[in-house]
């Protein structure tokens, strides 16, 4: 696997299309922070991490539905290993459909709205709506 974040986003997308209640994947600090932002913004119900018997940490995301439809209409990787995308806080614009962009900034992982308020730019990890 060359891009673990793209894998995470694909698992969320596929899990919701298949109407799964939760998806589980190998954990990392970045994935946990992305999950935290998704929970704060109301795109997932909850998430938790656990250590497996083999010593690896896993993260389980509880997916969220509204009237039987997935809350996440689209989730798209923006910055990827072959093409990094960085934006200044001045260049951060709204996402169609009340969506958010998730950024990695010098002050941590946050939405584009928080980054604008704090006056920081960073790498645009993904867009969610």
From Swiss-Prot:
Protein name: Small ribosomal subunit protein uS8
InterPro entries: Ribosomal_uS8, Ribosomal_uS8_CS, Ribosomal_uS8_sf
Function: One of the primary rRNA binding proteins, it binds directly to 16S rRNA central domain where it helps coordinate assembly of the platform of the 30S subunit.
Key words, A-Z: Ribonucleoprotein, Ribosomal protein, RNA-binding, rRNA-binding
Top-level taxon of the source organism: Bacteria
One GO BP annotation of this record: translation
PANTHER family, per the entry: 40S RIBOSOMAL PROTEIN S15A
GO CC, any one term: ribosome
GO molecular function, one term: structural constituent of ribosome
Annotated NCBIfam families: PRK00136.1 (NF001109)
Oligomer status and interactors: Part of the 30S ribosomal subunit. Contacts proteins S5 and S12.
């Amino acid at each position: 696997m060359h891009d673990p974040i793209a894998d995470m986003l694909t698992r969320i997308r596929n899990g919701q299309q298949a109407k799964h209640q939760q998806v589980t994947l190998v954990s990392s600090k970045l994935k946990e922070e992305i999950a935290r932002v998704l929970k704060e913004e109301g795109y997932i119900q909850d998430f938790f991490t656990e250590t497996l018997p083999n010593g690896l940490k896993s993260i389980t995301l509880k997916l969220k539905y509204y009237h039987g439809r997935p809350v996440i209409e689209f989730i798209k990787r923006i910055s990827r290993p072959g093409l990094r995308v960085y934006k200044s806080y001045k260049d951060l614009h709204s996402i169609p459909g009340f969506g958010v962009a998730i950024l990695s900034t010098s002050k941590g992982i946050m939405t584009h709205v928080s980054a604008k308020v704090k006056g920081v730019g960073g790498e645009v990890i993904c867009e969610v709506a």
